[in-house]
């Protein structure tokens, strides 16, 4: 397949994003292929983002702001060529609306896995929830997108085996984490900005 970037008139920023999103997982996986072969594990690249900018109301389940809708469309452009076959969201409309442009573009139905809190500590995520999302994202190898929340994305990176566990504040919406899982519980993490 020949790609003519000049005829498509991609601007320099879009071209750089395309190169990073498409080539970074290959670079990260290159050093991990041997470990994956030894463990009979399919290398998986998982893209994690926090939902896009949300409205203030209704507080329980707000929709996206116009800026959030634009960010969701930009995410679809950025990850449109990343060969994503699995998309996972929470039950909240802000995550579904963030994933929707990419899901529509790829013809992929997003899987909704409701966020569950620990029965032991209401401030912690349920270990079963984290395991279910990580297992679903890595089930078939390939590439996956998880759209989460400021409190779920760091914990999901950890559940996937990542050693970089960022803190995401409530005003930050432009983080894109690329987690290359090369063995059960072992991964490399790259932190990009959308």
Please place each PLM-identified region on the residue numbering:
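N-terminal export leaders
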Residues: 10-21
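Bacterial N-terminal signal peptides
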Residues: 19-29
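Periplasmic-binding protein-like
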Residues: 143-147
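Sec/Tat signal peptide C-region and signal peptidase I cleavage site
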Residues: 32-36
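Secretory targeting signals
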Residues: 2-7
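Active-site-proximal alpha-helix that buttresses catalytic centers in soluble enzyme cores
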Residues: 40-141, 153-155, 159-194
């Amino acid at each position: 397949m020949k790609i003519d970037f000049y005829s498509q008139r991609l601007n320099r920023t879009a071209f750089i994003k395309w190169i990073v999103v498409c080539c970074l997982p290959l670079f990260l996986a290159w050093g991990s292929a041997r470990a994956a072969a030894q463990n009979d594990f399919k290398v998986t690249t998982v893209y994690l983002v926090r939902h896009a900018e949300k409205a203030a109301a209704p507080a329980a389940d707000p929709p996206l702001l116009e800026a959030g809708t634009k960010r969701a469309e930009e995410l679809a452009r950025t990850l449109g060529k990343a060969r994503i076959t699995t998309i996972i969201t929470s039950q909240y409309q802000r995550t579904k609306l963030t994933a929707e442009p990419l899901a529509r573009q790829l013809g992929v139905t997003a899987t909704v896995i409701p966020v569950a809190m620990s029965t032991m500590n209401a401030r912690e995520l349920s270990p079963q929830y984290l395991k279910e999302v990580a297992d679903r994202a890595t089930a078939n190898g390939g590439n996956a997108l998880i759209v989460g929340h400021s409190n779920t994305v760091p914990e999901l990176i950890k559940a996937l085996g990542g050693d970089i566990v960022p803190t995401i504040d409530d005003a930050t919406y432009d983080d894109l984490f690329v987690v290359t899982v090369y063995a059960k519980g072992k991964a490399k993490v790259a932190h990009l900005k959308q």
